[in-house]
Amino acid sequence: GGPNERKDYHYDESEEFFYQVEGDIVVKIMDNDTPVDIPIREGEVFLLPPRVPHSPQRGSNTVGLVIERKRAEDEKDGLIWYCEKCHHKLYEEYFCLDNIETQLQTVFHHFYGSTEHRTCTQCGTVMAQP
């Protein structure tokens, strides 16, 4: 459920199935280093192909279901951040996901705790901390 205003993009080796139960959302994807917004309206489904960086943006009072297949033991998830101005990749980190609550917070700390990671090497824009 929403709201969700994260700036990271999730990387998954397999497809993800979205079913939007209440309200409308936008799933931001990166397609060849170009941001694309995919609206998913209430009652709609969407199958995200594998290996597409994506960032679901949920407003208040939205409820959705996301189904992912079980990962192989050595399969990694990733979080990627892109410059908000020029879309150059800022930082990426990959990990075998065992505990979503603790592991995501650790990766967020690695990124947001480092001005170097948040600074675009292409245009110099610095992503603000949340």
Language model features with spans:
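Jelly-roll (double-stranded beta-helix
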Residues: 2-19, 24-45, 53-130
